[in-house]
């Protein structure tokens, strides 16, 4: 079985990261590509299902998983814990399915340290002006919040050079095409192709 690839995707808020990942998943069958499902201690919201949106666990269970080094990365956000299970990711990758993980640069650093075979993608907006427009377009934040988000975005973008691939999301369809191209290129790497076509290669090279 050909091993799947873990893709780490990071971007500042407003760059279109989540929209690109969701659009990608709609074009890929589940046996090819999936999105990572995190563990969390926060309460389940209406319409959310365990194992579909999150793995909902108690704080005691989560802390035990930390002690057992069960997470590729974890963080505490607004009094709730969130983490990416190493076992859950490895089980999916072992079936040959590629996994996408939407995470910030700090989480990406943790994951690369524990899983160096992961591929990382950073998504940039085409300009600060466009990023500001997108943040304002949500129509739900005050000027103070928008200014804070812009400040955080600049800090986040400063880490772009730590990633393997860089996509500028100016034209959404072009950015989506770039994302698909990265996946296609990774699947054509020698190691994966050799595994996939081992029988064919053996026959072609036989005397």
Swiss-Prot record:
Q: Which part of the chain is the Guanylate kinase-like domain?
A: 4-184
Which keywords does UniProt give here?
Answer: ATP-binding, Cytoplasm, Kinase, Nucleotide-binding, Transferase
What highest taxon heads this organism's lineage? Answer: Bacteria
For this protein, the Enzyme Commission number is 2.7.4.8
Q: Where in the cell is it found?
A: Cytoplasm
What the entry lists under Pfam families is as follows: Guanylate_kin
Q: Where does ATP bind?
A: 11-18
One Gene Ontology cellular component annotation held by this UniProt entry:
cytosol
Q: Which HAMAP family match?
A: Guanylate_kinase
| Name of the protein | Guanylate kinase
Gene symbol here is gmk
């Amino acid at each position: 079985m050909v091993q799947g690839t873990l893709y780490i995707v990071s971007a500042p808020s407003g760059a279109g990261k989540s929209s690109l990942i969701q659009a990608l998943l709609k074009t890929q069958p589940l046996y090819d590509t999936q999105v990572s499902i995190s563990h969390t201690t926060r309460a389940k919201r209406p319409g959310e299902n365990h194992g579909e949106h999150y793995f909902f666990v108690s704080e005691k269970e989560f802390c035990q998983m930390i002690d057992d080094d069960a997470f590729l990365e974890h963080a505490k956000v607004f009094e709730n814990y969130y983490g990416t299970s190493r076992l859950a990711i490895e089980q999916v990758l072992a079936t040959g399915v590629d996994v996408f993980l939407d995470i910030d640069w700090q989480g990406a650093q943790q994951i690369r340290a524990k899983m160096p075979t992961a591929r990382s993608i950073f998504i940039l907006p085409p300009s600060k002006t466009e990023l500001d427009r997108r943040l304002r377009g949500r129509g739900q934040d005050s000027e103070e919040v928008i200014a804070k988000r812009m400040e955080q975005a600049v800090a986040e973008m400063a880490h772009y050079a730590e990633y393997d691939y860089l996509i500028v999301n100016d034209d959404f369809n072009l950015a989506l095409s770039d994302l698909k191209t990265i996946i296609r290129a990774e699947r054509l790497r020698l190691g994966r192709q050799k595994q996939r076509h081992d029988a064919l290669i053996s026959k072609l090279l036989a005397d």
